[in-house]
Amino acid sequence: MKIQREIIETSDGSKTIHLPEWNENYHSHHGALQEAKHVFLKNGLDDFVHQKEISILEIGLGTGLNAILTCQEATKQDLKINYSALEAYPVSEEELEALNYQSFLEDEFARSHYAQIHSAEWNQRQTISPNFSINKILDQLENCNFEKNQFDIIYFDAFGPRVQGELWSLEIFQMLFKSLKSNGLLVTYCAKGQVKRDLKTAGFVVECVPGPPGKREMTKAFKRDL
C-alpha cells in the first residue's frame, strides 16, 4: 500500500509525518517529542525501571522516536532493554533526514544510536548499545502471534481507530494480553470509550491518566495477577 506522506512541524518545534489522505499524524501536532516522552516514558517505561531488564514491544516503529528515547533512558538509568518494534510501512531515509530528530538528541552517542536503529536489519535482533537491543519486525499486526508472557510493556502507537480500526479490535487486544508478562502494561495515547471497553473485555485492568499537551486523557492497561 502506497500512502502519501508529508513532513509538518509540531508545536514544540519537533517535526512529524502527516498523512493527508487520512488526515492523520504520526505524532500529536501539539508536540511530537512531548507526546512521546509523556505517553511512553513517563507513563510506560518509568513504571518498570526497578526491574533493570525490560522487554518492550512497540506497535508502530514509525519515525523511531519512541525507540531512541527509550534507548537514551536505558543508558541514563543503566537498564537492559530488549526492544521489539513492529512496522508495516517503513519510513524512508529522505523522510528521516527531513524530520531531523538528531537535532533534539542530547549527544553524539544518541545520534549514532538513532541512525543504527534505522539501519538495523529487519526481523533479527541487533545490539545498538550495551543497554539496548532491537528486533524490527516488518509485518502487519494482524499477521502476528507473539509468544505468551513475552513482554513487560507494550507501546501501542498505531494510527488511531478512526483510520485503522482493525488494529484496535478485541481480538488484537486479547492476543496482546497473552503476550504480556504478569503485571505487564499496555500504554497508549488513545482514550476512546470503545477501546477501553475492549481492553477490559480482553482482561486488562484499565486506568485513565492525564494525557500529553492537547489530550485530556490517555490509557494504561495492566495485566494483573488474579
Predicted regions and their residues:
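Rossmann-like AdoMet
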Residues: M1-I54, Q72-L105
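Conserved beta-strand/loop positions that form the S-adenosyl-L-methionine
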Residues: L57-I59
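Glycine-rich SAM-binding Motif I of class I
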Residues: G64-I68
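S-adenosyl-L-methionine
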Residues: E97-E147
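Short SAM/SAH-binding signature in class I
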Residues: I134-K136, Q150-A158
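Conserved beta-strand signature within the Rossmann-like core of class I S-adenosyl-L-methionine
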Residues: I153-Y155, S182-C190
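A short glycine-rich, Lys/Arg-flanked "PGG" loop and its adjoining helix->strand segment in the class I
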Residues: L167-N183
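Core SAM-dependent methyltransferase catalytic element
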Residues: A202-L226
